[in-house]
Amino acid sequence: MSKFTQQAIIDTFLKMLACKSLDKITVKEIVNECGINRNTFYYYYKDIYDLLEDVVSTEN
């Protein structure tokens, strides 16, 4: 798995977060938008909240 894929997940998540609330974003939407498999998402993150934690920690 590449850093590019992980960054694509983060970028897609941030784009979605700008348009709707966190509780309305699903893993399925993220992977469909990225064009990746759900297993790829779960390789990097346990769930949406794990992704959010990664985004917040890298922003600081």
Ranges and model annotations:
Residues K3-Q6, I10-L14, A18, D23-V27, ...:
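An amphipathic alpha-helix adjacent to DNA-recognition modules
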Residues V31:
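The alpha-helix within a helix-turn-helix
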